[in-house]
């Protein structure tokens, strides 16, 4: 007879309750090395260490190709950032927000869904990688399409006369097909008259690529935001499954959106 069997009814004390949940995976880290630092950058910090949420239904536990491409592009084009107001939607690990701060943005507002773990992680990454005396990054939990006041308050307090954002970053968000209208409405309403939105994405579901691209048709036809393809490049896909779709999944698309004149 085993020790557990000899305990009789008391053995039940050692059974996991039906509602038992295992502890969540611990956060892990990814390193990003800046390879396009220009002399205009406010900081020459080269290595950025990002903490990623252990697991997240909102995909904040991965450093996606689109986020890396976005960071590279921003570092290569400091004129988009320096002295400007920047809004990042769906920031996840907030790499683009960090890059904007290091390039001397006047103010960066880094946002994502108001999930406590996700927002705490964004705060951690910013505090770990942006010098405190820069004082040019704020974070805000935000649901696309909701009241803009909390976002605008961050640039109003620095005395920005424009009242809107010079640059809005949407990195790897267009796979949320049901959210296209909200994303575009938010972008249209918060983008300064001469501002630009940077939209970068990879086709995570190759069969739905056309749905991804409908974002840009919708931007043009319903929201009067003009899409301009920057480029499409091929990088190693995030996942190795399904050889038949590997080429499509390796793509990274980058666009600008501007207000129709």
From Swiss-Prot:
EC class: transferase
Domain of life: Eukaryota
GO biological process, alphabetically ordered: methylation; rDNA heterochromatin formation
Keyword Cytoplasm appears in the UniProt entry: yes
Record-linked InterPro entries: EFM7, Methyltransf_16, SAM-dependent_MTases_sf
Residue span of region Disordered: 1-27
A Pfam short name: Methyltransf_16
Molecular-function annotations in GO: N-terminal protein N-methyltransferase activity; protein methyltransferase activity; protein-lysine N-methyltransferase activity; S-adenosylmethionine-dependent methyltransferase activity
HAMAP family: Methyltr_EFM7
Protein name: Protein N-terminal and lysine N-methyltransferase EFM7
Organism of this sequence: Saccharomyces cerevisiae (strain ATCC 204508 / S288c) (Baker's yeast)
Organism classification: Eukaryota, Fungi, Dikarya, Ascomycota, Saccharomycotina
Gene name in the database record: NNT1
């Amino acid at each position: 007879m085993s020790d557990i069997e000899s305990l009789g009814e008391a053995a039940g004390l050692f059974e996991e309750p039906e509602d038992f949940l295992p502890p969540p995976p611990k956060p892990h880290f990814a390193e990003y090395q800046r390879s396009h630092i220009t002399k205009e950058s406010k900081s020459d910090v080269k290595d950025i260490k990002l903490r990623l949420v252990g697991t997240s239904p909102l995909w904040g536990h991965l450093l996606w190709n689109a986020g890396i491409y976005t960071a590279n592009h921003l570092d290569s084009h400091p004129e988009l950032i320096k002295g400007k107001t920047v809004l990042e939607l769906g920031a996840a690990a907030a790499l683009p927000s960090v890059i904007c701060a290091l390039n001397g943005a006047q103010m960066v507002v880094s946002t994502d869904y108001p999930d406590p773990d996700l927002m705490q992680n964004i705060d951690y990454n910013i505090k770990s990688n942006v010098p405190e005396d820069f004082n040019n990054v704020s974070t805000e939990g935000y649901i696309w399409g909701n009241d803009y006041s909390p976002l605008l308050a961050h640039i109003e307090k620095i005395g920005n006369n424009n009242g809107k954002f010079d640059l809005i970053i949407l990195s790897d968000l267009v796979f949320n097909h049901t959210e296209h209208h909200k994303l575009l409405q938010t972008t249209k309403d918060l983008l300064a008259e001469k501002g630009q939105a940077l939209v970068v994405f990879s086709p995570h579901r190759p069969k739905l690529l056309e749905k991804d691209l409908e974002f840009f048709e919708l931007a043009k036809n319903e929201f009067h935001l003009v899409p301009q393809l920057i480029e499409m490049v091929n990088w190693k896909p995030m996942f190795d499954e399904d050889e038949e779709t590997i080429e499509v999944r390796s793509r990274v698309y980058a666009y600008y959106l501007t207000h129709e004149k």
